[in-house]
Amino acid sequence: MSSVIASRRYAYAFLSAAEAGGFLETVTGEMQMVGETLAASRDLQRALASPLINADRKTHLLEEIFAEAVGDKMMLFLRLIAHKKRAGILGGITQEFAALLDEKNGIVNAAVTSATELSDSQQKALSRSLEGYTGKKVRSAMKIDESLIGGLSVKIGDTIFDGSVRHQLQLLREKLVAVEA
């Protein structure tokens, strides 16, 4: 089984259990903190993924790092992951948990790239437009790329809306080349 599929299954199972048990709000913050800790420590990621370190040692490592910072339910989940020899995909589990939670709450992530910085009113108008298109709440991550020349590009999931001047020039170039051929 691929690590992405396994990560999604563990994340879904934990999310479902947390929702049914009434502790979803608590573990949401804890899961985010675990993910941030993993993202910040390459050594921790390597240790958890290493086949040379046994499950008991990985459990002990997770307990040392997170026992004071997380509650009993989250610690039990971390022990389970280590016991099942899935500690190496813990980072993926935290990402999938966040994605499933967003899906449950009707939130989509949009990567917005513009040639210049958008004003607050432009960002709000863009968010309203994207929310109207998707029918969901939109969380935007803004980025500036001057090579777009003008306009902007928006990526939501697998869909890209490219309204940049660079893209329009590229389309025009392709049409001119096709006419010449």
UniProtKB/Swiss-Prot annotation:
Major localization listed first in the record, in broad terms: membrane
InterPro entries: ATP_synth_OSCP/delta_N_sf, ATPase_OSCP/dsu
Flavoprotein among keywords: no
Pfam families: OSCP
Keywords on record: ATP synthesis, Cell inner membrane, Cell membrane, CF(1), Hydrogen ion transport, Ion transport, Membrane, Transport
Family annotation (NCBIfam families): ATP_synt_delta (TIGR01145)
Name under which the protein is recorded: ATP synthase subunit delta
Organism, as annotated: Chlorobium phaeovibrioides (strain DSM 265 / 1930)
Source lineage: Bacteria, Pseudomonadati, Chlorobiota, Chlorobiia, Chlorobiales
